[in-house]
A protein has these predicted regions:
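Short inter-helical turns and helix N-cap capping residues of alpha-solenoid HEAT/ARM repeat scaffolds
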Residues: 45-46, 77-78, 109-110
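Bacterial N-terminal signal peptides
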Residues: 5-16
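N-terminal leader/linker segments that initiate helical-solenoid repeat arrays
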Residues: 19-42, 47-51
């Protein structure tokens, strides 16, 4: 009996999460209060909070966070936090953000951080090339 109840609960949970992820209007508006809270979190002394804020700023592609994230990438002593900042900069994707990631490949003292930055920059360039190839294909097909 316990086995059947467990299977039922797991199936219900699976169905709920499947339908919950299909909501296209999950995040439609990002309030200024949210952005300022995340940017303030970058100045916290709590390492976990800083990492989480950097991650969310990247996920939300908040371009006003580029300068504080660049500062973390250049100056912070913690490798994990610098990697989180580099990932956020990669996700934001502005030319200034991508350039900061590119420069960290050459100038960061940590080989681990440099390798992660190289991976992020490689993905950026690969996606850029794919987009250019798609555009070229569309132009060529439209001219036929």
């Amino acid at each position: 009996m316990k086995f059947l109840v467990t299977i039922f609960l797991l199936t219900s949970l699976l169905i709920e999460t499947s339908y919950a992820s299909g909501n296209p209007k999950a995040i439609t508006e990002i309030r200024q209060n949210t952005i300022s809270s995340l940017e303030n979190g970058l100045n916290s002394k709590n390492l976990g909070l800083k990492s989480s804020c950097a991650y969310m700023l990247g996920e939300l592609r908040i371009s006003t966070a580029v300068i504080p994230l660049m500062k973390i990438l250049r100056e912070n002593e913690n490798e994990d936090l610098r990697i989180a900042a580099a990932l956020a900069l990669y996700k934001i994707g502005t030319p200034m953000a991508i350039n900061a990631v590119k420069q960290s490949i050459r100038f960061d003292n940590s080989e681990r951080v440099s390798k992660h930055c190289a991976s992020f920059y490689y993905e950026h360039m690969k996606n850029k090339l794919i987009d250019e190839e798609k555009n070229d294909y569309v132009v060529k097909t439209a001219r036929k």
